[in-house]
Amino acid sequence: MSTIGFIKRGLDFAHKALADARNGTGEQLHFVPPNGSHSIAWCLWHTTRVEDLIINARILKQPTIWNGEWAKRTGLPAEGFGVGQPDDDAQKVHIDDMDAFAAYQEAVWAATARFLDTATDADLEREVPSRTGTESVGEAISLHMLGHFNGHRGEINTLRGMQDMPTVMAAQGTH
């Protein structure tokens, strides 16, 4: 399997899990346990905003899909993406319209797929800006998308378990 193929397969798995994580009531998706944490809704918003920023702004050097219109449609903050966000602010993140949010998620994932469909191994070596300097495109995707998203998938499954909900992708025989 090529490196690009590996990335595509890993992101496909993460995206399916994140899509499945949208299933639940508003109360379940916005549940925050005592002692602080994020909600499932926060995890969904954060992972999608991160992917949008990495693929579109950093790698493709174009505007992100997110704009004020998506904020209005979903009820989410127009600014920010969750990194460094205090728990109190994170717990206020609320997705008012999950269908609109799902449309944003799908648009971001489609942009990522278009990039990966034409990317080469040389593209993965190109340096792009990061919060601490630069990193390769491959590092940005593997660290901040593949690894990070699967960490949030575990967080989502923990939050679902605390509410007696099935894990994401349980119907597919995995989690």
Where are these regions (language model features)?
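Helix N-cap and loop-to-helix transition residues
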Residues: S2, T25-G26, S39, P86, ...
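Short, charged, low-complexity loops and linkers
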Residues: M1-I7, A90-V93
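Short, contiguous alpha-helical
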Residues: K8-D12, A19, E27-G84, E127-H175
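Hydrophobic alpha-helical core bundles mediating ligand binding, dimerization, or RNAP-core interactions
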Residues: I7, L11-L18, R22, Q105-T112
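Acidic/histidine-rich alpha-helical segments that form the ligand environment
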Residues: P77-R126, A140-M145
